Amino acid sequence: MNKALKVLLFSLLALSLFVVAACGSTEEPAEEAPASEENTEESTDEANDETNEEAALEETGELVVYSSRNENFVNALLEKFTADTGIEVKPLHAGDNAVSRIKGEAGNTQADIFISNDIGALENLRLEGLLEGSDPEGIESIDENYRADDNSWFALSARTRVLMYNKDLITEEEMPKSIEELTDPKWQGEFAITRGGNGGMIGHVSALRNEWGDEKTKEWIADVKDNAGAILEGHGDIRRAVGAGEFTFGLVNNYYYHQQLQEPTDNNVGVIYPDQGEGEMGAVVNAAGVGLVKDAPNAQSAQVFLDWILEEENQREFSYESLEVPINPEIEAVEGAATISDYKTHDMPLSQLGEVWEDTRELIEQAGLDLDL
């Protein structure tokens, strides 16, 4: 066979193979395309879900929590969070310095979550643009009166200002029934209060300013300071001193009374919820809660924490550890504790505490009560 014929035959063979291939093709792959795209979308959704679940761990694998609460009230809660989620917590128990630290780190945020013993401090941070709004799962379990408009903070447990007394030294009938009575000379040296910078004291004075005005409140602070037998670092110091009989009574948050009742000794104490009479202001209520710090470095971890803390069992853990009263009405208070619906309370909205928080600190100092010992 000559060379030209071979080329011709080879060309005809190639052409026939091309025709067969073309005729044998169908539109089926094109018809299956939508199903293929659907599978791809499902796979993408599943991948996104997995990514969201793992995102918190992929950021840094940790959560930085600043807290102004007693670390004994917080540590077990944070350990439970780590056990439940796998996210490691780096806590900073900064006491009253937590707020100033967050303010000082503005623009270089280190904290993700702030756990506060004072709603006024949380609202003050929000007003200064240092907290960030959120929509955590379960937020509807917290009444709107106990959370920011943008949910950047929310309360979890309530505490009320009370007079805890030693039953071996005084009877309930003999006890003062109003906060104003603490200026009476008859109580000179008989009671103890905290330093002015304590969160409970700041919130209490803010409520008195709302009720009485600044001048009367300043006079009350000065007179109570002079009348008190001691000014102590914190309420735990007061409750132990009252239980031991070092003072007849002390001005504390109500859960310290319940803590003293659980002591093996020095537990013969009683409690007075002040200003319950007709026309009186009612007992002053504050709350502890959590806030989402703006520009949190571990934003995904912070969101996981907010969702987690609003689960009912964790709300219970938050309040029961300190023997406070849960804000969520669906959670029963600890045995023997009065709920805020059981007594008359002052009507100042907690959200207003933040508006006057810094001014109240200044007024306390002006009245002569040191913020720190």
Indicate residue ranges for each PLM-predicted region.
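Early extracytoplasmic/lumenal segment of secretory-pathway proteins
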Residues: A55-N124
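Ligand-binding pocket segment of bilobal, Venus flytrap-like solute-binding proteins
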Residues: A207-P274
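Immediate post-signal peptide segment of exported/extracytoplasmic ligand-binding proteins
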Residues: E28, E32-A33, D45-V64, E79-T85, ...
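C-terminal motif of bacterial Sec signal peptides marking the signal peptidase cleavage site
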Residues: V19-A22
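A bilobed periplasmic-binding-protein/Venus flytrap-type ligand-binding module shared by bacterial periplasmic
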Residues: M164-L169, V285-N298, E317-F318
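A structural signal for short loop-to-beta-strand junctions that line the ligand-binding cleft
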Residues: T109-N117, E132-L163, E180, E190-I193
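Periplasmic-binding protein-like
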Residues: S141-E144, R159, G189-G196, I221-K225, I231-L232, W308-I331, ...
